[in-house]
Amino acid sequence: MHRQLRYAVLATALFASTAFAGARQELDTFTRGLKGLDGQFSQRVTDANGRVKETSSGRVALATPRQFRWEYAKPYKQLIVADGKKVWVFDPDLEQVTVRAQGSEEQNSPLVALIDPALLDKKYDVSEEAAPRDGLQWLSLTPKVDTDASFQIASLGFGREGLARMEVVDAVGQRTAIGFSGWKRNPAFAADTFRYTPAKGVDVVGDAQ
C-alpha cells in the first residue's frame, strides 16, 4: 500500500468497550462520553490472494472532532496527523511532508460515525456476527452508498479491553488487519498531538495555508 494513502484505510479505526455483551451494545456503551483514545497498533496488509504486502506498527491517537495521529515506528518512520481541517503526511527519510484538506475519506469512514454514533446507521448497514471469532465479538459495517467509501466492508472485533482488531476489505479485495492494544480512554493529550509544524529544511507539498 502506498505510504501516503494509508490514512484512508487507517481512518476506519476505532472505539470499543470492556463489557461481554454483543458488539453493538459494547460500542454504544463505550462511545458515551468518549472524547479520545491513545494506544498502540500493528498492521498487516494482504492482497486478494492472501499474500502479505506490508506489515507495520506504531502508535495511534484519536480525538473529537476529526483529529487523529498515526505514528509509524516500523518498518520505517512516518507520521500522519489530522487537525480537523488538514491532513499532514510526513516522511522523515524524504524530508518531505504532504498536506491536503480533510475530505471525503474521513467524512465517509467509520471513524466519523463512531465518534458521532448518530451517523452510524445513517451511513452503514450494521450487523453483528452470530458467533465469536478469534475470541472476539464482531461488528460489521457495510457502506450504504458504495461510491461514498474507500472500502467494501469493515469489521470491528471487541475483546475484554475494548477494540482489539479491525479488518477492512477494499474494492479490489485487499485486506488490512489492524490489531490494537494498550488503549487509554480520554487521555490528557499534549497540546501539539494533533498539530504539525514543518521543521526547517522540510519540503512542503500541497496547500499548507
From Swiss-Prot:
The keyword Transport applies. It is found in: Periplasm. It comes from the Bacteria. InterPro entries: LolA/LolB/LppX (IPR029046), OM_lipoprot_carrier_LolA-like (IPR004564), OM_lipoprot_carrier_LolA_Pbac (IPR018323). GO terms for biological process: lipoprotein localization to outer membrane; lipoprotein transport. Residues 1-21 form the signal peptide. GO terms for cellular component: outer membrane-bounded periplasmic space. It holds the Pfam family LolA. Gene3D superfamilies: Lipoprotein localisation LolA/LolB/LppX. Keywords: Chaperone, Periplasm, Protein transport, Signal, Transport. Monomer. Participates in the translocation of lipoproteins from the inner membrane to the outer membrane. Only forms a complex with a lipoprotein if the residue after the N-terminal Cys is not an aspartate (The Asp acts as a targeting signal to indicate that the lipoprotein should stay in the inner membrane). Belongs to the LolA family. This is Outer-membrane lipoprotein carrier protein. It comes from Xanthomonas axonopodis pv. citri (strain 306).
